[in-house]
Structure formats: C-alpha cells, structure tokens
Amino acid sequence: RDKRKAIIINAEISVPMLPVWLPEQIIQTNASVGQVLSSVEIDTSLVAGHVTVLKSYPFIGVMGYSAGENPLSYPEVKYAMVLQLVNAAARLVDFVILDCSSNMTNVFTPAAIESGDLVIRILTPDLKGVNYLKAHQPLLGDGRFHYDQHMTFAGMARPFHALDEMGHIIGGWDGLLPYGKEIDRCATEGGMFQAIKYCNPKYTASLNKVLDALEQMELADHAAEDEGNETEHFEEETADE
C-alpha cells in the first residue's frame, strides 16, 4: 500500500533463489546469504552489504543463495545465526519477509516462524496439503512458535478443489490464493515481482487481509509505546512531587 522499505530473505539452499528472482542479473557469490550465515557474528553492516536491491522496486531488497551454490557450499547453518540475521535485517528496514520452505529440518524455517510477528501459512487445499499440516503440527507445539496465531491461506486454489471440506479439517481458511496462468508464468519465467498485476479480486483480498493484520499489529505496538511513555511521565511527576 505504500513504499516502506522491505527485505525478502530466502535461506533454502536446495534451490538458490537469487537467480530465480533475478535471472537477468549476474549476482556474484559474495552477495549470497550464505556468506552472512557462515560469519562469526551478524550485524547490520554485514546484512546491508549482502542485500540485492530490485531495480524496478528500489525500496525492496532480496537476500538468498547465489546460482550454483548447494548444501555443501557452506558449513551447516546454526539456528542462532538465523535469529541474528533476522534481528539485524529488522533494524535496517520497515518489514522483513522470510520466505520459508516447507522443510522443517532446514533451521531457517523454524527460526523464521519463531521470530516472525505474523506467520503466513500457505497450503494446497487438497489431501497432500492437509496431511502435511497434520504431520508438522506437533513440531510447532512449543509456545515460541505461536501456532494458533498463524494465518492459513489456500494456495494454488482451483475450482475443482474441495475448499470447504479441506478447510473444515484444518479449522478454516483465512483466504484464498487462486491459481492463475499469468501468475504461474511470471514465476516460471523470472518475472515474479510482476505477478501482482495479474492477481484477481480474491487473491488481492487475501493480500489486503495480511496488510490489515500488519496494520493492526503496528497500531497495537504504537498504543503500547504511548501507554509506556505516559506511565513513565506520570512516575517522573510523582517523583518530583
């Protein structure tokens, strides 16, 4: 809705995302998120130096693995380093979007879920998607993953999907992300950041639902800050008296 700054981070090394997001750009290995996650310590300057800014959307930056990198390119990623990466990125921009895989054994996914203020879960509305969720739900039972607060969307939804039945099994959908040929083409042809032009009203409504949730969280944070400032001011006045 506005042009506040954001960084999109994907740390799934089985499919390096920089050449998928930006196939027309030659991105050197030294721009890889692997360089950051394998560092001794992660700070804002290190993160800023490994962000690739989108030419079409200069307020959006991306971080991911570079072309040709694989699981043996770097030492095993540590959970704590992912948290450091997220915290450092959050100090640089207004929003950090963590693009997770469905693989919970990749430490980036559980660490991202733990650190996320708003978690969006996208499932295919079929038996495969539903059973994936049922299988992984026990892994997210710890309170730090705030499982019950996640938003769940039906992704790649098609007219023949049993949306109501699948939704009943998982407790309901927060919205639909319908399949669209144009969106699929954007993803497969390297134009992923152009896909917003082809979103139908149901897709857009789901995106707006996410934005509304973020706005509500921001308002709640501002209200809490104001209340804290008022309390501090009252305590100072009481001390003066």
Indicate where each model-derived feature is located.
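Inter-motif core of Ras-like GTPase G domains
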Residues: 91, 107-126
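Well-ordered beta-strand positions
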Residues: 95, 118, 172-175
